[in-house]
């Protein structure tokens, strides 16, 4: 199938920190979701493009084929906005942005998707809002992945800790669920459908 006329390329940005030492940490669950989505799209390779690792793909949907970019900023979490701004300004055409990030306000395994709003204490998302807002009045839809309450552990330490072994099955399940919802959204292009799917109660709960 060919890309339908007028279709906007999707830009899905997963947030995390580069480097093996951060690969399994809670803050990097956004990277995990993008890796899972890339596998669903046919093991698309991530190649360095400016300040991000980017994979290209195309998804078939009811209206035809839609191009998509999957991006993992390599600027470290707190400077994610710089990488995203580069991708938006260097694009040959309009991009529909959606950000995937961790959220310690949500229970482990929960998803929440919104069209817009505040950063909610997520520094990578805050950086994106800061840098993208200067481009236009663009909304920044975001899919938050719950990583659990830090309790008495300072949040800045908690997010850089790896998931516990007992938590891993729940993490793998929510990562796969998020990737599935994103795959569906890429095909249909319906953000309301994505929001409804992500905000529905977990059928396994």
Region locations from a protein language model:
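Acyl/amide activation-and-transfer machinery of modular secondary-metabolite enzymes
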Residues: 156-161
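Nucleotide and nucleotide-moiety/phosphate-recognizing core
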Residues: 1-119, 126-141, 149-154, 169-202
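A hydrophobic, small-residue-rich beta->alpha segment in the mid-to-C-terminal subdomain
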Residues: 165-166
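Extracellular serine-dependent O-acyl
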Residues: 145
């Amino acid at each position: 199938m060919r890309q339908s006329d007028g279709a906007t390329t999707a830009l899905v940005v997963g947030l995390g920190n580069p480097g093996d030492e951060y690969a399994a940490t809670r803050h990097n669950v956004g990277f995990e979701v993008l890796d899972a989505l890339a596998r669903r799209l046919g093991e698309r390779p991530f190649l360095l493009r400016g300040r991000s690792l980017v994979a290209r793909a195309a998804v078939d949907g009811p209206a035809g084929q839609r191009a998509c970019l999957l991006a993992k900023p390599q600027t470290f979490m707190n400077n994610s906005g710089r990488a995203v701004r580069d991708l938006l300004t260097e694009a040959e055409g309009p991009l529909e942005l959606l950000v995937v990030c961790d959220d310690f306000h949500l229970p482990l395994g929960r998803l929440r998707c919104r069209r817009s709003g505040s950063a909610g204490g997520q520094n990578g998302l805050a950086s994106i809002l800061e840098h993208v807002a200067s481009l236009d009045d663009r909304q920044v839809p975001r899919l938050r992945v719950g990583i659990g309450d830090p309790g008495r552990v300072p949040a800045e330490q908690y997010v850089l800790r790896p998931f516990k072994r007992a938590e891993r099955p729940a993490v793998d399940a929510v990562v796969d669920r998020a990737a599935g919802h994103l795959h569906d959204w890429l095909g249909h292009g319906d953000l309301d459908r994505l929001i409804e799917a992500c905000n529905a109660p977990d059928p396994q709960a």
